[in-house]
């Protein structure tokens, strides 16, 4: 043992949340200007005697904080992974249901050619499946590691048994063992954040698309609405896309936090706290916001009202114009594609200018 077993047993016995006054810890932390020293002193006092001298033995503050944050991050990851499965299942069901629901496709915000709503949803589904795959790869990449390596990560204070101690502790905690110290290497957190950022971007895009399709003049979808919900304090008739706006709006703070996580890569020497502490702000926000988006998206899609009649009306709004590509290729079989394009282009421009089909 690195420390006496009696000391280890006493430390385990006393290291309970209920044994600490967090207001006192906060006060001492502010006075000492150190994030962990107050807890170390409080635990030493709880343990007492000679055994108390072995509290925080061999490790450094960043070992404790990094390992603790990684445990929280892994717990958040597992929640996100579970909720992602529900989201994908919900979207897959909706996609199958609307595989033949005709609508107009839009490019640059303008009517293009016919598609199905199921086709649009399939693209979203494929993107979400890629995010799910990236999430699972985080485990394969050993992103969730702990750190029990001492002052500069060299195990100098473990009497030659540092790796042995680290492996035993991290096995107990369910974290992977790093190849070497990662105190100055924050790429794992940045990788985690970037994967979640991509996921959030997809959900933000879905939210923005649904926001557009729910506009009064388009009216192709509606988010779930319960009796008694209020859209406006001054306009009683309003049914606003409140859930959809919430889905879309959370992507921006996630993106900002992902950028903050990348700043934490810029560590000086063996470690510093200039950028390291960014993680304390960014990681909880990224995981919380993304999970809220996933849960929100699942609810929206599970109760989405699809106005198939309006989709068909919008498809037919410009008469035969959405079929100009097909007509061009049919004509092109005899005249050539470029010649056919010019002929159909002239006819289409005339129809648009004279408001004809």
Give the positions of each predicted feature.
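Short, well-ordered beta-strand elements within core beta-sheets of diverse protein domains
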Residues: 119, 190-198, 326-334
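A helix-coil-helix interface module used to build multimeric assemblies
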Residues: 2-149, 153-155, 161-168, 177, ...
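Conserved helix-loop functional segments at active or binding sites
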Residues: 97-100, 134-137, 141, 175-179, ...
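Glycine-rich cofactor/substrate-binding loops
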Residues: 2, 9, 13, 27-32, ...
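Short amphipathic alpha-helical segments with heptad-repeat character
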Residues: 74-85, 92, 122-125, 129, ...
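Amphipathic alpha-helical coiled-coil scaffold segments and their short linker/junction regions
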Residues: 167-193
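Solvent-exposed alpha-helix faces
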Residues: 89, 96, 126, 133-134, ...
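Glycine-rich anion/phosphate-binding loop at the beta-strand->alpha-helix junction
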Residues: 131, 183-276
